[in-house]
Design a protein with these regions (language model features):
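Negatively charged
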Residues: 2-120
């Protein structure tokens, strides 16, 4: 699923609730460059086997909030640039994020100038 929607600059909303992601290990840069994306539903993503999440939301500058509290990050080793330049992002729930195995979180929140709180 790496780069799956990369550069889809006209994409405004996306519902991927029915995607089967049980065996996916790499979701890096999946939505990178989707600068018009305002609504994203990935609430049912199974991320149990994911190791690479780097840049998944990189450049999603129109997203204001989304909930990742069902994301299982136990096996993730790379989260670099995950929310890079998500300049409209105001709230983010990362309460369930386990970063014990993460080696790279560089620039994870770079350019998130509107981010005000971590929903708890």
């Amino acid at each position: 699923m790496y780069n799956m929607f990369y550069g889809c600059t006209s994409l405004k909303e996306l519902n991927l609730n029915n995607f089967n992601t049980n065996n996916v290990t790499n979701i890096g840069y999946m939505f990178s460059g989707c600068s018009s994306l305002k609504e994203l539903n990935i609430n049912n993503f199974n991320t149990n086997n994911v190791k690479y999440m780097g840049g998944i939301f990189n450049g999603c500058s129109s997203l204001k909030e989304f909930n990742l509290n069902k994301f299982n990050t136990n096996n993730v080793t790379d989260m670099n640039c995950m929310f890079f330049e998500c300049s409209s992002l105001k709230e983010l729930n990362l309460n369930n994020f386990n970063t014990n195995n993460v080696n790279d979180m560089g620039c994870m929140f770079h350019g998130c100038s509107s981010l005000k709180k971590n929903k708890s």
